[in-house]
Amino acid sequence: RSNKNCEFKTIRKIIYNQKNIAIEIQSQNIETNKIDYKETLNPKLPKGISNNKNIIALIDTGVNYTLPQLHKNIAFQNKKLLGYDFWDNDNFPFDQDPRNNPFYPRHHGTTVFSVLSREAPKSTIAIYRFPALNMCKFKELIEHIAKNSIRIVNLSMGSSNINDWLCFQEAALKNNKIIFVVSAGNNGFDIDKNPIYPASLKLDNIITVTSSDLNGRVGRGSNIGNISIDFMLPAERVEVIDHRGVKAFTGGTSYAAPRLTAMISRLITANPGISNEDILKILKKRSIKSNKKVTKYGWIPDPLDNYLFN
């Protein structure tokens, strides 16, 4: 990284192991030649005990599972972390997306996890790193979720290329008892006219959500669509824990989705045998219909309230 005079200020390098797998990013001070900062990639997994709590599956860029404040909500099975890294094909679904810049990887999943853990505290979360390099692995990913009897999935991502999501669509249709809560996207347009996938897929077990402010107005840049988008929730200023373990505020449809996922998870915890159809009925009763053609069912202003759950 250089300054405006093209003078180097920082050097970053990626360290690989003998199997040619990236294990660490090091930041070197150009003046002292000392390593100022190290970012571990795929660190050791935490130890945990198996639990039978209501499980949410989080499909994202991974999670920083080393953060102590997240451990109580990480799902374990046979004392091993429940989930998988379908990007790297290993058991370390650590939060990183190196596609734009491998020296400064993007992080996203940890913040989403933190919303789920705070708003569905009695649930545990299985961590899945999505298969960015081969999107047809979504078939295998969803089968893994189904095999572990997980009923609800949070998916805060999408793209405009339907070909990326054909295998996902096939697997989601086959496993139609699983509810997929999907973010509508932050492109600032109507996804009925400009589809974003998987949000725009016509599947009964996909619930698409967009973001609002506290007064029910569409969030800045949040997509709309009274056919493709089911609900709108306040998510323009959401407290999160980022991949460093630091509290911060963020917003957008990526965080409206986990708010609705957490709400559904609490509903399932209170009513373990509830059907997908009855879940949708309760969500519709909780929503306020707007005259504006923004969503199909309306705005849920109070996703932390358990009204109608018992």
Q: Where in this protein do the model-derived segments appear?
A:
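Protease zymogen maturation seam
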Residues: 1-55, 68-69, 298, 303-310
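Active-site core segment of subtilase-fold serine proteases
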Residues: 39-123, 140-152, 215, 290-291
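Short Gly/Pro-enriched turn/cap motifs at secondary-structure boundaries
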Residues: 46-47, 103-104, 187, 219-223, ...
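Hydrophobic/aromatic beta-strand patches that form the interior of the parallel beta-sheet core
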Residues: 57-59, 84, 126-128, 181, ...
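Extracellular S/T/G-rich loop segment that most often corresponds to the catalytic His/Ser-adjacent loop
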Residues: 60, 196-269, 273
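Glycine-rich, phosphate-binding/catalytic loops in enzymes
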Residues: 68, 72-79, 169-172, 197-200, ...
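Substrate-binding/access-modulating region of protease and related hydrolase catalytic domains
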Residues: 107, 111, 119, 123, ...
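C-terminal subdomain of the subtilisin-like protease fold in secreted/lumenal serine endopeptidases
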Residues: 150-157, 163, 178, 205-208, ...
